[in-house]
Amino acid sequence: MVYYVKIGIGSQYGLAKYLFDFVYDRQIRNLRGSGKMLVFSLNRMSLPADQVLHKLEERGIRINHYAEKYISHPRFSAGQPGEITAAVVSLEELGLENGASLEELFRHIQGTPFRPCPPDTGFFLRLAWTDQPQSGNSILTGTHRSPDQAVTIRSEILVQDDAFPKGLYLRKVDGELWLRGYVCDPAYHFPGETLFAFETHRT
């Protein structure tokens, strides 16, 4: 089963949820049919970095310095405006029970309906997804693990430098919504329970 959510900014789209039967695409050979995924339809607009940061502040969404650095990159909002579909699914549901690095994950989704999201997907998803489940682990210093209930946006790498953020992730802590950037080296192994968002299409 899949939860499908139609989302946009402002009054363009109301927030509605639909539960419908989903037949997994045969191309996703390793995806276990017993699971669930969230599918979001997002209306993307081309916004400069200062407007993105202002909108986040206006909505009371917290960010870290890695997120600000990522958002300020010239390629962050360089894509064409329009509607995209993003799916949130765990590595386990993709058949990666033991987890994967970003490169292993990229290779694993080749030939499936999943592909990396445009860099600004996390921004639009964060504005819309206000009822994200709460994270249980609010303090993560020194853990080097993905936060509980966090969703990592699998987007293209903007800069081939391990000191530059690889992307964004969404979490909700103590009732506050966050959009955070993260850094990791190529060898970092995301656990199997990690939730990722990909661009996809409905089958």
Predicted regions and their residues:
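A binding-site-centric feature that preferentially detects glycan-recognition modules on secreted/surface proteins
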Residues: 1-203
